[in-house]
Amino acid sequence: MSLRILVTGASGFVGGAFLRRFQGQPGLDIHGIGRRACALPNYHRIDLSQPFTLDWQPDVVIHAAALASPWGTRAQFELHNVQATANVIDFCTRNGNPRLLYVSSSSVFYREEHQYALSEDSPIGPRFVNTYAQTKYLGETLLDGYAGLKSILRPRAVFGPGDTVLFPRVIAAARKGALPRFVGQSQPVIGDLIYIDALCDYLYRAAVAPQLQPSYNLTNAQPVDLQQLLLDVLARLQLPLPQRQVRISTALRMASVVEGAYRLLRLRGEPPITRFGVGVFAYSKTFDPRRTLADLGTPSVGLDEGIDAFVRWQAAQWV
């Protein structure tokens, strides 16, 4: 009998990658839902902001749908990250309480400071770096009342083919010659990342694991110097390296001013610079991987292999 898995957010980066990676695998019956049109098999276009039904009952639900952005209105984030999660839980409750895996975000832990070896038990809140992080945590709290087996999975800095958030923004700035080289840090800024295929495999392992702990932080377990990694990727893509030096403290102040102007004037779109975006290169964020390694194993794709694959994919987009 096949294991029936439903993945939400299947028209997005993580959910779509999971659907493509595992659909058609022996012993699996996978369906995806999302708010955008999508040509993938077994895909259902469903608006999660409203209660929904399916003529199909899953054994596992991977809730990867979210508004993943450093910028947006509170109403948008609450609709897509909180109300949608409540509707997914409602669906699960009406369909036999399947195992529920909530794909949250490592940003729920973040503060505007260096943070090393963050564990699943590190403190969360009461203040958050942005509304995205706050509403992802509010989504986490909704699982408290769910009667089925559940776990919260918090990936850190997901990248790979199909990425629309992490590398594409800095690559676009580099192509325009608008990317600065940040200076003024007292120490190298290091951080964890996770390659998309490694994340998808962790999601699958969590779907079939005999037992699960309440939460897992998902990384490639290989912290790197983030600015040096970016420079290496730009060089391999034959893009101009940033020459203009900007102190990180200056960039943070500039981002605050720009964000304030966007809020005051109610400007459309995302600001060209945000404190969250600058913070990636301002503050180290590393994670203690021991719980994940013990329960879910080592990453299926190493960080270097993932970066190689991303560079090949990105270069092919310009051919």
Stretches with model-predicted labels:
Residues 5-24:
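N-terminal Rossmann NAD(P)H-binding glycine-rich loop of SDR-like oxidoreductase domains
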Residues 45-83, 87, 91-94, 111:
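NAD(P)H-binding glycine-rich loop region in Rossmannoid oxidoreductase-like domains
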Residues 87-131:
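Conserved Rossmann-fold NAD(P)-dependent oxidoreductase catalytic core, especially the SDR/UDP-sugar
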Residues 114-159, 163:
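Catalytic helix-loop patch of NAD(P)-dependent Rossmann-fold dehydrogenases
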Residues 146-152, 156-198, 233:
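NAD(P)-dependent short-chain dehydrogenase/reductase
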Residues 196, 231, 254-299:
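Conserved C-terminal active-site "lid" loop/helix of NAD(P)H-dependent oxidoreductases
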Residues 202-270, 308-311, 318-319:
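Mid/C-terminal beta-alpha module of Rossmann-like enzyme folds, strongest
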Residues 287-319:
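Amphipathic terminal alpha-helices
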